[in-house]
Amino acid sequence: MNKKQKVYVGVSGGVDSSVALALLKEQGYDVTGVFLRVWQADFLPCDWKEERRSAMRVCATLGVPFITLDCQEEYKKEVVDYMIAEYSAGRVPNPDVFCNKFVKFGVFLKKALEMGADFIATGHYARKFSLAHSSASGLYPLSGGSDDTSASECAQENFFQLCESVDLNKDQSYFLYTLNQHQLSHTLFPVGHFTKPEVRKLAKKFGLSTAEKKDSQGLCFIGKVDMKDFLKHFIQSKEGDVLNTKGEVIGRHDGAIFYTIGQRHGFDVIKKSSESGASFVVSKDIEKNTITVEDRESERNTTYSTKEIILKNINFISGVEPGFPLKAQVRIRYRQEKQSCVVLKTGESYKIIFDAPQSGVAIGQSAVLYDGEICLGGGIIDVA
C-alpha cells in the first residue's frame, strides 16, 4: 500500500486556508495544519492569538494535527524592516510579496520539508500547471484539474507554471511572482480552482467555523492597520507642502514618505485655493518633502504618466530567461487590468515599454509579467 503524501497546510484562521486543509484531507493526503507565528508590534492589537485559536478549531473539526511554527525573526527582518527601510528612502514597497517570498514559501517551506512534508499548501487564489499538460489551445491542470500532484509526478514533470485563479477578482498571482521551480514543485493551491462563493459553500459543507468569517485585509499577517500610523512608530514625520500640478501650494501634509503615488488621499487644503477634498498623489519629492496632487475627475494630466519603467532584476518563474524583445502583459499594481507591453534587456536591467501611457507608477512596487493567464514573473520598479 502506498504511503500517503504528507502536506503541511498553512492555516491562518481564515476561510480560504481552512477549505484548503479540508479539501486536501478529503483527497486523501496526510495533512497537518500549521499556524505561522510572526512578529507583531506591541502597539497593535494582539489578534494573532485569536487567529491561532480559530485555526486550532478548524483542525479539531477536521480531526487533523495542529502545530505552530515560529517565524517571528524572519518576518521582522525580511518584511517589516525592509518595509520601513523602503518607505524611509521614499519608495513604496509591497510587503505581501516579501512575506510570500521569505516567510510562506521561504522559512515555512524549508522547515516543512525538513520535518518530512512532501508539500506545503496555502489558501492563495492561484493555480499550478505542468508544462507537459500544455497545448496550443490552452493549459491543462495536473491530475485532472486539481492540485493533487504526486511526488512521482513532481520528479518526472519538473517544470511548472503559475497561473491566475479561476476567480479573477480574488486572484493572487500578482503577489507570487517571486516563486521558483523548487518552491512550485512542493506547493499546492487547492482553492485556486474555485470562486470565493464556492469556497464559502465548501466551508459550510465541511462544517467549518470560518465559513462566514470576513476576509482579512491590510498588511500580510498583521491585518488592517493604517500604514501611516504604523510607520510613524519607526519613522519621524515632518510636515511639508502639498502642491497642485501648477506648482502652487494648496495644503499641508505630514511627511512625503507616507504617501503613495496613485493613491487617493485627503489633505488640509488652504482655503484660498480652488482645490478641495480628496486628491490623487501624482509625484513626490523626498528631498524637498513635497507632494504633488491632482483631481482625477479633471482632465488627466499626462505630465505624470509614463510609457516605460526600469526593473533592476526580473525573476522568471521558469528559471530561464525568454528571448528579448518579449511581448507580454504587465500589472504595476494589484488588481490592475493587464497592460500590453514589450520587455527589453538593457545591460543588467530590464525596460518595460507600455503600449499605452500609465499613471500612478510607484517606485518600489512590483511589475508582474503575464502571458495570458500564465504569470511569467516580475520585479521591483526602480525607475519610472
Predicted segment positions?
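ATP-dependent adenylation/nucleotidyltransferase module used to activate substrates
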Residues: 1-177, 188
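AMP-forming adenylation/ATP pyrophosphatase catalytic core
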Residues: 121-127, 142, 157-384
